[in-house]
Amino acid sequence: MIKHIVMFRVADTAEKTKQLLAMKSELEKLPSKIPQIIEYEVGLNFYIAPQAFDIVLVSSFESKETLQQYAVHPEHVKFIEFINPFRIEVVVVDYEY
């Protein structure tokens, strides 16, 4: 099994809350559209600190191959294109368990 964790930090603008809610909503749609996803959890951070990220995705996949299939899936690519205008930093961790 593969665990895929992604943390996003969004630019501090007047639109930040709206953007985070839109990101969360769009992320939550992906499991119904991408069959490679086994487990999927999205959360908004409530801890305010300079080092904190705004939103986290924790997901599981059967293998490195299915994670790669997810990465290039048209619905995932569409999400990446959707968030490109307002994300400023992304951190990713993938590991086997």
Predicted regions and their residues:
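Short S/T/G/P-rich N-terminal loop/turn motif that feeds into the first structured element of a domain
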Residues: 1-54, 62-69, 95-97
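An amphipathic, aromatic/His-enriched active-site/gating alpha helix that lines ligand/cofactor pockets
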Residues: 17, 60, 64-93
